[in-house]
C-alpha cells in the first residue's frame, strides 16, 4: 500500500474538490463527533489511531481496482483469508470502511479513483434491523453504526409503488444502489453481501467459499438442479399460466445433460411424496448437493408455505429452524428463492435465507427478495438467470445476477429472449397491475439481493458433445459417440424427457384418501415421487480413455417417442456431461 500523493491530489481535484474528497474520506472512516462521543473515553486515542490508519492506508491506494470491499474494521481479520485467496487470483481489492449511512458509504465508493475499472462490490456484515415507518427508521445498533466496533453495514430503502398495493412494507430494503453508479435504477457492477453477525460466522463462511471453488471438482452432485414448488393460490387462470410458464422455463432453460428433480407441494401431483414426509424430502434434496436449489412459491421472512392435504394439518415446507438439519453431502448449492420476503436481511432476526447461508453445512450463496414479490417480474428474473447460467455459463455468480437484473429493468425485446416476450404478453392481460409492469420490474431489481460472494466461481460440470442416430427402433442397439476429454468411468443413459413419467400414476383423489385406513392412507406416494424423479430407462457403464469413444446401448424397456441420451464421465479431477436426442420407434 502507498500513502496518498497530496500534490497529485491537489492538482487533480483543486481546492474545492480536495475539500469534498477529504470530507467523504472522513465520513467513510466513520469519524464524526456524535459517534466518537459514544465510544468509551478510555478508547478515544485507540479509536482515533485506528481510524487515522484506515483513512491514510486502507482507502487511499491509487491502483487499478476491480473489487470494492465494504467491510467493518471489526471483521477485517476474519475476511483476510478471502482477501489473500482473491488477490492470488489476480483481483485488486479496495477497502472501504462503512459509514453511518448507506448514502455516505456509497459516496465514498463513488469518490474512489479509477472507479470505472470496478467490476464488483462485496459488502461484509449484517444490516441494521428495519422497524417500520415512512422514512425507513432502523433499530439503533449496539455498538452504534459508524463506530469501529460495529459489524453492520447499512442498506438503502426505496419507496414501493407496486408491491405495496399487495401488502408489502412501504419501503424496499436493497443493496442495489451501492452498485448503481449513475443512479438510473440499473446496477452497473456485480454486488453481494456476506451478512455475518460476528467473526466466527464470517470465518466459517470464508472457509466454505474457498472450499467450494477448490474442492468438488469431480463430484457427481454438481450436475444436480433441484426445484421445490409450493401451490400458487393466485386463482385458476393465474396458477395455470404460472405452471405452464414454469414448465417451459425449466424444460427449455436447463440443458438435458443435467439431472433435475422436482418436489411439488400439491398432494395430487406425482412429484409430491407422502405429505408427512414432504419437509424432510425437501431437506434431503438440499443435502444431496447440487449446482442450484430453487424454491418457487409463497414465502415469509422465517418460513416457506405449507402443504395442505386431506385429513392432515397444514404441513410446513421449510422453516428457518430447519437450518440445523442442513448437512449437505455434495456440492453446497446456490439457493434461489422466487418467493416473498425470504431474503429480508434487515429483519430483527436472521431471515430464512441468511440462516441457510450461515449454516455450517448450508448454502454457498442465496438470491432472495426482501419484500412481497409478484409472479410476472419473478418469472422474467428467473428466465434471465437460467440463460446467463446455462446458455452463456457466466463464470461468476455476481455476473449472473448482474446481467439478470439489467435485463429485468430493460424494455421488452432488449434481452432477445422469446420467453421474455411471452411473459410480457401474458402479464399485459393477466397481471392485476398491468399498467405498472415497468415499475414492477424495477422494484424486483431492488428487492432481489445476492447474499453471497459476487466473485464466486460457479462450480459447473464440464461439457462435451454427444452424438447418436436420430431414430432407433425399440429393442435395437443405439450407437452413442463422444470425444472423451478425460480418463474415467462413463455412464451412458437413455432417459425420458423432463415432465414425462415412466410408469402409470396411482390414484390421488379425496375419496380414495378418505376411504383408506390412516396407516395405509399415503402408501405408495413416496415411491411414486421417487419414480417420477427417476427418468432412466437404460444405463450402461464403460471405462474410457481420452479420445473418440463409441458405445452401443441396447434400447429396451423404453417407451416410444422422443427420449434423451445422457453421458457422464467421472474423472479424478473432473466431471464431464453431455446429451443428445433420439426418437424411439416401435417395432
Identify what each model region corresponds to:
Residues 85-88, 103-261, 276, 412-416, ...:
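Structured catalytic cores of large enzymes
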Residues 95-96, 128-129, 338, 342-466:
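Active-site-proximal C-terminal subdomain of hydrolase catalytic domains
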Residues 112-135, 143-144, 231-232, 238-241, ...:
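Catalytic-core segments of thiol-dependent peptidases
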Residues 153-208, 301, 306-382:
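Catalytic cores of nucleophile-dependent amide-cleaving enzymes
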Residues 455-490:
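Surface beta-strand/loop "capping" patches
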Residues 477-507, 563-567:
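Beta-strand-rich binding/interaction modules
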Residues 518-552:
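Aromatic sugar-binding surface patches on proteins
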Residues 574-585:
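Edge beta-strands of extracellular beta-sandwich domains
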